[in-house]
């Protein structure tokens, strides 16, 4: 194994240990081939199945990339006229005064300025477009928007138009316990639990997938919607999702986003992507440890999976996320041989 590959895997194992995760997986694709694959640990912090190819991790908020593709379809098919349409043009069930001036672009780039109290009431944190803040409310609103536009859940569109053509068997919004599912650890001293939701409508944080299928999801984007020579998703849909859609902020530290994806323009203090990662790369992350990095310049897809809630580093977590992407990008900059390594 190339020393740089081993160095990256050692780093993944170190963070797994430091953050009290019981599981880790790495899949790297370059030039449409799996060149590195690694699995370690077990499905929970008690007696559990060993992690392997068929282990399905909860990817938490990395599910945004799936919702993003569905909204890309809605734009492509003219269900939405423009990203700059006010969300109130479509959804009338929200306080129009609070939502005033809030566009679909704002919701898709975390610049909407909305937040939610414990009692479910919505308030404005800052004027739409003036800043950036990661809040979960936009995911719910966009999920509702898709159902309003199509009269069915976005998960159905993905199953029919994307998952079936790709041959996905292990990507699902899980509603029942299964031995294939990796449990999530909230606290090291407590038993890990299944992260389920009663429905597969996309509203819950119950999307599970294997490291391989997550990598293939990234590779579909890398190849602009093509899979094995077939155009599965229109190229324009992918381009909408993975090119910068956020507006310029007065605060230069704030990250750039496509449709939810972090997109590398130049190094930003509050971005999850490291400064050494080439321009045009994009990344999605979940708070249970899944990370998907796509580097078009190197025709590279990197997947890293954990099963511990909250990424390592506490308030300094962005440093470790950037460090991983820097290390991964550096390790695979030189075109790699097609031989696959598995530990």
PLM segments and residue spans:
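Short, conserved catalytic-motif segment at the N-terminal edge
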Residues: 2-57
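Active-site helix/loop module of the DD-peptidase/beta-lactamase fold
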Residues: 7, 53, 58-61, 76-115, ...
């Amino acid at each position: 194994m190339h020393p740089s590959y081993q160095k990256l895997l050692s780093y993944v194992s170190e963070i797994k240990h430091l953050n009290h995760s019981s599981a880790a997986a790495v899949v790297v694709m370059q030039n449409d081939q799996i060149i590195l694959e690694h699995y370690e640990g077990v499905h929970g912090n008690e007696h559990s199945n060993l992690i392997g190819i068929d282990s399905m991790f909860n990817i938490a908020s990395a599910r945004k990339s799936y919702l993003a593709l569905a909204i890309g379809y809605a734009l492509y098919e003219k269900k939405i006229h423009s990203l700059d349409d006010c969300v109130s043009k479509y959804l009338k069930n929200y306080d129009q005064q609070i939502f005033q001036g809030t566009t679909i672009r704002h919701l898709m780039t975390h610049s909407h300025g909305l937040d939610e109290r414990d009692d479910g009431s919505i308030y404005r944190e800052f004027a739409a477009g003036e800043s950036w803040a990661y809040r979960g409310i936009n995911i719910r609103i966009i999920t509702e928007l898709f159902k309003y536009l199509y009269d069915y859940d976005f998960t159905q569109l993905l199953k029919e138009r994307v998952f079936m053509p790709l041959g996905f068997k292990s990507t699902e919004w899980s509603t029942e316990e299964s031995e294939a599912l990796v449990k999530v650890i909230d606290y090291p001293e407590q038993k890990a639990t299944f992260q389920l939701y009663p429905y597969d409508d996309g509203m819950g944080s119950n999307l599970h997938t294997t490291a391989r299928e997550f990598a293939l999801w990234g590779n579909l984007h890398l190849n602009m919607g093509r899979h094995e020579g077939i155009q599965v998703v229109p190229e324009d849909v992918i381009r909408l999702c993975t090119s910068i859609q956020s507006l310029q902020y007065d605060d230069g530290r704030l990250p750039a986003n496509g449709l939810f994806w972090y997109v590398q323009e130049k190094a930003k203090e509050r971005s999850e992507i490291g400064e050494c990662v080439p321009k045009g790369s994009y990344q999605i992350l979940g708070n249970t440890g899944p990370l998907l990095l796509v580097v078009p310049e190197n025709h590279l897809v990197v997947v890293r999976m954990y099963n511990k809630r909250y990424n390592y580093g506490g308030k300094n977590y962005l440093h470790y996320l950037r460090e991983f992407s820097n290390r991964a990008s550096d390790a695979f900059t030189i075109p790699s041989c097609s031989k696959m390594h598995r530990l």
